[in-house]
Amino acid sequence: ALGAILSTQLGEPAFSTPVVLVTLSVLGSQILTGALNDWADQGRDALVQRTKPIPAGQVGPRGALALAVGGLALQVATSIPLGAVALLVGLAASASATTYNLWLSRSAASFLPYLVSFALLPIWIATGVGAPLERIAAAPLLVGPFAVAAHLANTVRDFDADAHIGSGNLAQRLGRRTAFGLAWGMAMAVGIGVGTAFVVGGSTHVVGLALGAIGLAAVAQGIMGAQRLWAGMLVAAVCWTASWALATG
């Protein structure tokens, strides 16, 4: 969504070649990250999440690794035409996610890859579609805290399973209630803070304000539980990304 909005604001089609390429490169990164996560967590999943692809027999460990390599190949192949900066920023985001999968997911520093990878995402997209970086200069400062909140919300969903295997991720160190409260509070603070800044600064857009409000309501209802918070944050991520692009265009 961000790439398409930035492209139209530059006077280009919403689905221009750069937008399609950057979308495919991000998709490749997601495939790499997801497949590598399944491979790295196969032992854990066999104990507590047997519906995951490897323990369920849907794919073997080698197949998961092959899929991860394929995702990386897709990311690189579609990033090269976008230029060196987009290629390197995208690889940095994927490298950060890889450190989570292979090393940091069970440590108190489990939030760091989320902070880095998601903060790099708007820069990756903007450089890919050729938008001026000043357009999204403040975005990483806002995306980062939201990403940490998303990490906490996600790990609270798996709190019992992680506790069963002795995971030491940040949510486990903080405790279920504290981690959930921080996740909800940080996400709400980001939404309220950004919305207030736009209104006070006069950078308002009717559709953007509506999307911002929808995202805030989606997060607010998440106070009812971890699953609802996670779903609400997914909705907010889409709404707030579009709202940001419209308000700063």
Where are the regions a protein language model picked out?
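Intramembrane alpha-helical segments
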Residues: 52-132, 221-224
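Small-residue-rich segments of transmembrane alpha-helices in multi-pass membrane proteins
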Residues: 1-6, 112-130, 171-176, 231-248
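A cytosolic-side transmembrane-helix exit/cap motif
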Residues: 38-45, 107-115, 131-137, 156-163, ...
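Lipid-exposed faces of alpha-helical membrane segments in multi-pass integral membrane proteins
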Residues: 20, 24, 28, 67-77, ...
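Multi-pass membrane catalytic core of lipid/isoprenoid biosynthesis enzymes
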Residues: 22-24, 42-90, 167-204
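Extended hydrophobic alpha-helices typical of membrane-associated regions
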Residues: 199, 203-249
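Functional transmembrane core segments of multi-pass inner-membrane proteins
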Residues: 5-17, 114-159, 163, 176-188
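Membrane-embedded alpha-helical segments that form the functional core of polytopic membrane enzymes
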Residues: 2-40, 75-76, 80, 84-98, ...
